[in-house]
Amino acid sequence: MGLSPNMYRDVGDFSPISTDVIIIGGGATGAGIARDCALRGINCILLERRDIATGATGRNHGLLHSGARYAVNDQESAEECIKENKILRNIARHCVDETEGLFITLPEDSLDYQKTFIESCTKSGIEAVAIDPKLAKIMEPSVNPDLVGAVVVPDGSIDPFRLTASNVMDAT
């Protein structure tokens, strides 16, 4: 990969500028802060030593949590996840793939827990729908064939580079 001769320059090559906020790091957080500053009319500069989303953002799993996995034991985290899930689906739907999440119950598990799981999700504002195990096998052919229960939740997949790039573009 060739480097642009203009990409790396001495600090002395730049004219002094004034800004309200300096953001260090062009990942999801830095780009999101830059977008938020721009929407609020706050002047900012985003500094990144490489390309956007090349650090931790570019290496994440891309799962857009519904919060369901926290609903039973950590309602506060579950509520925060579904709130942010809905915000991202609203402002960056072009970056979200509607994959859904599937929680299964195996013969050694309690179907009573599945009921508790659904109730906890509902209490946290997360849609959780019990489905027939036969449908779960169609939805996910690699699922354990011995399952006795299944619940669908609004998990998704997000493209971290596309989200970061969109936020940077929105900030300019």
Describe each region flagged by the PLM.
Residues 61-139:
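Dinucleotide-binding Rossmann-like beta1-alpha1 core, especially the glycine-rich loop
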Residues 38-58:
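Glycine-rich FAD pyrophosphate-binding loop
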Residues 30-31:
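N-terminal Rossmann-fold NAD(P) dinucleotide-binding loop
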